[in-house]
From Swiss-Prot:
Gene label: MST1R
Disulfide pairings: C101-C104, C107-C162, C135-C143, C174-C177, C300-C367, C385-C407, C386-C422, C527-C545, C533-C567, C536-C552, C548-C558
Ranges where the Protein kinase domain occurs: 1082-1345
Chemical reaction(s) catalysed: L-tyrosyl-[protein] + ATP = O-phospho-L-tyrosyl-[protein] + ADP + H(+)
Active site: D1208
Superkingdom of the source species: Eukaryota
Residues with the Phosphotyrosine modification: Y1238, Y1239, Y1353, Y1360
Cytoplasmic topology ranges: 979-1400
Protein name: Macrophage-stimulating protein receptor
Disease: Nasopharyngeal carcinoma, 3: A form of nasopharyngeal carcinoma, a malignant neoplasm that originates in the nasopharyngeal epithelium and includes 4 subtypes: keratinizing squamous cell, non-keratinizing, basaloid squamous cell, and papillary adenocarcinoma.
Reported tissue expression: Expressed in colon, skin, lung and bone marrow.
Predominant cellular place of this UniProt entry's protein: membrane
N-terminal signal peptide: 1-24
Record note on what altering A973T does: In NPCA3; uncertain significance
Length: 1400
């Protein structure tokens, strides 16, 4: 025993009550997402043109005299549009061979090739002429020249010129065959007075065989526009690689002294063709030569700032280029890229593969490659290859274009000739150029399909088209973790992908999507997607946004006042929403446009806040409370002190913020007023305080009750001027822990709200601290009494009793009694320890005073009074013996008094048996004397003690003797009639199933008499005789039944199974399970019951010590083959290994020399659970019934852990032993699911199925799992709570599957707690994966049992609940039997049967 030091003042209060911060403490303004300041669902309508077919190519022209045009090519047609996208001219480009083909006619009379549609592959401008050149997929890929003829601001096309000379072209050498049907990219460069076409085409074996295209070539346009000059330079994929090595040319452009092509191609001619990467090919724009052709691998990766687990070190690669564009960059991006402003940068959108499928990162990434750096890397690669010393083994590469070679040798040569230069041959630079995603993965799921980059002011903007037909205009920056959107809008409702090629015309970009061409302003389509004034005026200057009343727009869109210099403040929330009419309130305003500087400093006189008629004085911002706001969120806070004026009235009012004379910020100044409703002035009222006394140590939990106690932001409870620590604040109640007092005295107690005292006069009395000196006894059980002795025990409002087992603590409060002694009850605690009790510390505390702890306190299970009637005394007996489970274990903990007829007897305990010698002075009359047992002050009359006199026998005893005699006579008469009839049939029914083994197998099957569940010889009911096969006889075959109660068992005649025929290795393995048949005595006239697989007899087993042990013997009649016998023996070996208090153990298996196997099981004197709960003589409580289910759950949890599936869990298959412990039985035919996942009953076509206990999926698929056992457990709980009512009694078994599939389930029984019915519903979930496990069910049912206070929760009537009319065999009760009335009212608590026995 030890004394505990005093606790902190509020410790006990915090134990009893969950802590809750007072109103106003640490309140923060709700963050407004940054996305809330914009709306990307705003519809913008931009000019568009419908081309009449999928747009294949597009190019724009701007002349020197303000003439401009847009050229749009679709299949078989070329459109000429004006700058407003109005059609100016249309030209037929196909089909080839069609008389209406205008371009075909330019080549003279045909035929010029095979007929077919013309898909435009090349559409470029020759700026020198100027002229438009188009090349299609027909006519061997020839091109046509269209001179441009300006007509005002519009442009027309002259008659086309055919760039094809028949006499200069032949199949093996065709300089005028330019376009490939697989795709061609062309860039036109003016050199001197000539135009050179830099052409790159995708090839395969079929295209290469049709005419003579080239992969890369430089062709000069003839001056007479008759075609291209022969003898052009070219590179082509070698014929041996045409099948496996495909090159896609994505983009081409000209800048500075070079022309560049961007390709997607396999990484190597020897590797997997699907392993792609991106390359940049560079050609000289000043010399039409290919000797300085260079390639460089571009590497784009996504490398997040915080690398994900499992991600590669260098970031996730995105090797496939989807679209690219080059442009000069603005100052900000140039600084981040470490280049000069205005330098050209190549931007590319990359994906993970050809299909652009999602990876672990974003769908698309954007990388930037400065052109100067690209050229530098290429030049350095040339130096490494051609300048000494050359690294050995350095390859020239491009093996798909040329013969393999090592640097510095030319292709195909082993040495460099003096007349040749290493630099005059194509080269793949050995190093790659690597960059990371500019957007750091922020594009996320967006799939970018088009890209165009522009410089606006100092800002670099990427204009991107997406797979779903949207346009994103985003500022390109690297230093942010969010996207700076100029706009994000949809081009239309079709949602078709935006195509790769984008053209610019003046201040507009032309995007193509499906058959539409859209004209999008570079500055964005508008400003309406900005929703707040602050966001509107912070937009880029080039957008021209301004605030127009209550919306953002461009000046041309605003009919009223439009300005760009100021915004009003905006209130969105404030706290608190109420304040005291007297006293101050610290008011926090939330919103935007309060400040324009990060410091949040408010100049004097700029901000005015009024609440109703009362001013609110601005407070300086507390820098210690400043918290960083994520850039994706925004919120501003403003605090002021509100002190109501004397004229302020109680009630609701408005909060108003006015900002004037604020100095301008970077983008605008704040000026205006914002008003928000919802504040109320209230008058707090204190009505009651309790308790008004407590110990000097403090810690007393004060409860202050009243009205409007939570108004404002500050309140204080003062006890003698010292603050009482608040633990909970609500509108009607305050809870606090008193501070320590200096002396024993009465001190003032007051409440202040907002610094003003609430009217009322209260006094608190400090008393002497309670001192606990002892706690007794040192053991007990739930709700048993504990005595606390000490001094000043009534100084505390309540003493608290706490039990701690080392892991958790439970508490109960003691009611006030005497200052020196208090009687308390132990708290609720469930003992789960296998030893039957739990040791821990029992403590007593009084508020904040020092406590007392009793170590080593033993917590025991509560005792359970018996429910069986007392046995009459024999004449020679002078003591009463009765069983009282758990009473002996608690004898040292509580007071126990046993009386007979009001006279006390000197009782003694022998385990759970109580022996009570009768007092000598006791006279037992004819009606006997009542036996009463009082335990810890609670008394129960267990029955009446009677002793039969010599003059007569009590009527009840006489009936008990005569009724069995009459039943025996009736049984003998029935047996004689049956024997006579059987002899006439010349068949003898053997007395047990042993003799059936020798019957002739060809004789067929003979049915046994019907034995219903509970057809037990011990019940005194005779077995009905059979006169032939009646309507109850089973038809041999597959069938369904509600339960095995209604089944009959046919006996199969079969050949004898010899013990010597069994596998010797198996017999050796199961020798510990087998019991010699000489040690087993079967009482074949004592039938306990029957099942589908056999009959159960009462028997005896003689162990090795010659002790006769009662047992139940189950003879199996359905095993017909030797393999089944061997399988049964192996299963018996598994069953022998099961050991759990709630699982029926297997004594052994007896296999006679000739005959069928017999199973020996422990004898259960109380029979099965169904018979028990249906019996009118039993009176279990709700807690008893649920505890039976808890024991079943524990047994099933064990079987599930052992990987057994029961398949037939029901109340009829659970047994009760002499201590009323439930044992799960009839799992012997369960299948070990270690062998296979589930067991199919289709393997046993004669098995009768307990369909009304089966899970839905078992009814549908005939498969069983542990989760189908969980369903059956739910039905078993329903049986228990209805005391054995048949489930689905009005549903035909063949309709049950449809009934359950509709979601319908068994109704909630009348006395079933809601929490238990919820457990049943969880067991009946249609999806087996959603059902709980048995481990979870054990925990949930344990909680339900522990929540039922006491052992006797509700008195159940002895009549059956929820049962309609039924046959006698369904109820296991004859219809003529009288109903039993409820227990007499003077019986306070019947003997509960629920708790399993605990070892003492």
């Amino acid at each position: 025993m030890e004394l505990l030091p005093p606790l902190p003042q509020s410790f006990l209060l915090l134990l009893l009550l969950p802590a809750k911060p007072a109103a106003g403490e640490d309140w923060q303004c709700p963050r407004t997402p940054y996305a809330a300041s914009r709306d990307f669902d705003v519809k913008y309508v931009v000019p568009s043109f419908s081309a009449g077919g999928l747009v294949q190519a597009m190019v724009t022209y701007e002349g020197d005299r303000n003439e401009s045009a847009v050229f749009v090519a679709i299949r078989n047609r070329l459109h000429v549009l004006g700058p407003d996208l109005k059609s100016v001219q249309s030209l037929a480009t196909g089909p080839a061979g069609d008389p209406g083909c205008q371009t075909c006619a330019a080549c003279g009379p045909g035929p010029h090739g095979p007929p077919g549609d013309t898909d435009t592959k090349v559409l470029v401008l020759d700026p020198a002429l100027p002229a438009l050149v188009s090349c299609g997929s027909s006519l061997q890929g020839r091109c046509f020249l269209h001179d441009l003829e300006p007509q005002g601001t519009a442009v027309h096309l002259a008659a086309p010129a055919c760039l094809f000379s028949a006499h200069h072209n032949r199949p093996d050498d065709c300089p005028d065959c330019v376009a490939s049907p697989l795709g061609t990219r062309v860039t036109v460069v003016e050199q001197g007075q000539a135009s050179y076409f830099y052409v790159a085409s995708s090839l395969d074996a079929a295209v290469a065989a049709s005419f003579s295209p080239r992969s890369v070539s430089i062709r000069r346009l003839k001056a007479d526009a008759s075609g291209f000059a022969p003898g052009f330079v070219a590179l082509s994929v070698l014929p041996k690689h045409l099948v496996s090595y495909s090159i896609e040319y994505v983009h081409s452009f000209h800048t500075g002294a070079f022309v560049y092509f961007l390709t997607v191609q396999p990484a190597s001619v020897t590797d997997d063709p699907s392993a792609l990467h991106t390359r940049l090919a560079r050609l000289s724009a000043t010399e039409p030569e290919l000797g300085d052709y260079r390639e460089l691998v571009l590497d784009c990766r996504f490398a997040p700032k915080r690398r994900r687990r499992g991600a590669p070190e260098g970031g996730q690669p995105y090797p496939v280029l989807r679209v690219a564009h080059s442009a000069p960059v603005g100052a900000q991006l140039a600084t981040e890229l470490s280049i000069a402003e205005g330098q050209e940068v190549l931007f590319g959108v990359f994906v993970t593969g050809k299909d652009g499928g999602p990876g672990v990162g974003p769908n698309s990434v954007v990388c930037a490659f400065p052109i100067d750096l690209l050229d530098t890397l290429i030049d350095e690669g040339v130096e490494r290859c051609c300048e000494s010393p050359v690294h050995p083994g350095l390859r020239r590469g491009l093996d798909f274009f040329q013969s393999p070679s090592f640097c510095p040798n030319p292709p195909g040569l082993e040495a460099l000739s003096p007349n040749t230069s290493c630099r005059h041959f194509p080269l793949l630079v050995s190093s790659s150029f690597s960059r990371v995603d500019l957007f750091n993965g922020l594009l996320g799921p967006v799939q970018v399909t088009a890209l165009y980059v522009t410089r606006l002011d100092n800002v670099t903007v990427a204009h991107m088209g997406t797979m779903d037909g949207r346009i994103l205009q985003v500022e390109l920056v690297r230093s942010l973790n969010y996207l700076l959107y100029v706009s994000n809008f949809s081009l239309g409702d079709s949602g078709q992908p935006v195509q790769r090629d984008v053209s610019r015309l003046g201040d507009h970009l032309l995007f193509a999507s499906g058959d539409q061409v859209f004209q999008v302003p570079i500055q964005g389509p508008g400003c309406r997607h900005f929703l707040t004034c602050g966001r509107c005026l912070r937009a880029w200057h080039f957008m021209g946004c301004g605030w127009c009343g209550n919306m953002c727009g461009q000046q041309k869109e605003c009919p009223g006042s439009w300005q760009q210099d100021h915004c009003p403040p905006k209130l969105t929330e404030f706290h608190p929403h109420s304040g005291p009419l007297r006293g101050s309130t610290r008011l926090t305003l939330c919103g935007s446009n309060f400040y324009l500087h990060p410091s949040g400093l408010v100049p004097e006189g700029t901000h005015q806040v009024t609440v109703g008629q009362s001013p609110c004085r601005p407070l300086p911002k507390d820098s210690s409370k400043l918290r960083p706001v994520p850039r994706k969120d925004f919120v501003e806070e403003f605090e002021c002190e509100l002190e109501p004026l004397g004229t302020q009235a109680v009630g609701p009012t408005n909060v108003s913020l006015t900002v004037t004379n604020m100095p301008p910020g970077k983008h605008f100044r704040v000026d205006g007023t914002s008003v928000l409703r919802g504040f109320s002035f209230m008058e707090p009222v204190l009505i009651a305080v309790q308790p008004l006394f407590g110990p000097r140590a403090g810690g007393t939990c004060l409860t202050l009750e009243g009205q409007s106690l939570s108004v404002g932001t500050s309140r204080a409870v003062l006890v003698n001027g010292t603050e009482c620590l608040l633990a909970r604040v609500s509108e009607g109640q305050l809870l606090c822990a008193t501070p320590p007092g200096a002396t024993v005295a009465s001190v003032p107690l007051s409440l202040q709200v907002g610094g003003a005292q609430v009217p009322g006069s209260w006094t608190f009395q400090y008393r002497e601290d309670p001192v606990v000196l002892s706690i007794s006894p040192n053991c007990g059980y739930i709700n048993s009494h504990i005595t606390i002795c000490g001094q000043h025990l009534t100084s505390a409002w309540h003493l608290v009793l706490s039990f701690h087992d080392g892991l958790r603590a439970v508490e109960s409060r003691c009611e006030r009694q005497l200052p020196e002694q208090q009687l308390c009850r132990l708290p609720e605690y469930v003992v789960r320890d296998p030893q039957g009790w739990v040791a821990g510390n029992l403590s007593a505390r009084g508020d904040g005073a020092a406590g007392f702890t009793l170590p080593g306190f033993r917590f025991l299970p509560p005792p359970h009074p018996p429910s069986a009637n007392l046995v009459p005394l024999k004449p020679e007996e002078h003591a009463i013996k009765f069983e009282y489970i758990g009473l002996g274990a608690v004898a040292d903990c509580v007071g126990i008094n046993v009386t007979v007829g009001g006279e006390s007897c000197q009782h003694e305990f022998r385990g759970d048996m109580v022996v009570c010698p009768l007092p000598p002075s006791l006279q037992l009359g004819q009606d006997g004397a009542p036996l009463q047992v009082c335990v810890d002050g609670e008394c129960h009359i267990l029955g009446r003690v009677v002793r039969p006199g010599p003059d007569g026998v009590p009527q009840s005893t006489l009936l008990g003797i005569l009724l069995p005699l009459l039943l025996l006579v009736a049984a003998l008469a029935t047996a004689l009639v049956f024997s006579y009839w059987w002899r006439r049939k010349q068949l003898v029914l053997p007395p047990n199933l042993n003799d059936l083994a020798s019957l002739d197998q060809t004789a067929g099957a003979t049915p046994l008499p019907i034995l219903y569940s509970g057809s037990d010889y011990r019940s005194g009911l005779a077995l009905p005789a059979i006169d032939g096969l009646d309507s109850t006889t089973c038809v041999h075959g597959a069938s369904f039944s509600d339960s095995e109660d209604e089944s009959c068992v046919p006996l199969l005649r079969k050949e004898s199974i010899q013990l010597r025929d069994l596998d010797s290795a198996l017999l050796a393995e199961v020798k510990d399970v087998l019991i010699p048949h000489e040690r087993v005595v079967t009482h074949s006239d004592r039938v306990i019951g029957k099942g589908h697989f056999g009959v159960v007899y009462h028997g005896e087993y003689i162990d090795q010590a010659q002790n006769r042990i009662q047992c139940a013997i189950k003879s199996l009649s359905r095993i017909t083959e030797m393999q089944q016998v061997e399988a049964f023996l192996r299963e018996g070996l598994l069953m022998r290994g099961l050991n759990h208090p709630n699982v029926l153990a297997l004594i052994g298996i007896m296999l006679p020399p000739e005959g069928l196997p017999h199973v020996l099981l422990p004898y259960m004197c109380h029979g099965d659970l169904l018979q028990f709960i249906r019996s009118p003589q039993r009176n279990p409580t709700v807690k008893d019934l649920i505890s039976f289910g808890l024991q079943v759950a524990r047994g099933m949890e064990y079987l599930a852990e052992q990987k057994f599936v029961h398949r037939d869990l029901a109340a009829r298959n659970c047994m009760l032993d002499e201590s009323f412990t439930v044992k799960v039985a009839d799992f012997g035919l369960a299948r070990d699911i270690l062998d296979r996942e589930y067991y199919s009953v289709q393997q046993h076509r004669h098995a009768r199925l307990p369909v009304k206990w089966m899970a839905l999926e078992s009814l549908q698929t005939y498969r069983f799992t542990t989760k189908s056992d969980v369903w059956s457990f739910g039905v078993l709980l329903w049986e228990l709570l209805t005391r054995g009512a048949p489930p689905y009694r009005h549903i035909d078994p063949f309709d049950l599957t449809h009934f359950l599939a509709q979601g319908r389930r068994l109704p909630q029984p009348e006395y079933c707690p809601d929490s238990l019915y919820q457990v049943m519903q969880q067991c009946w979930e249609a999806d087996p994966a959603v059902r709980p496990t048995f481990r979870v069910l054990v925990g949930e049912v344990e909680q339900i049992v522990s929540a039922l206070l006491g052992d006797h929760y509700v008195q159940l009537p002895a009549t059956y609940m929820n049962l309609g009319p039924s046959t006698s065999h369904e109820m296991n009760v004859r219809p003529e039997q009288p109903q039993f009335s409820p227990m007499p009212g003077n019986v306070r608590r019947p003997r509960p049967l629920s708790e399993p026995p605990r070892p003492t």
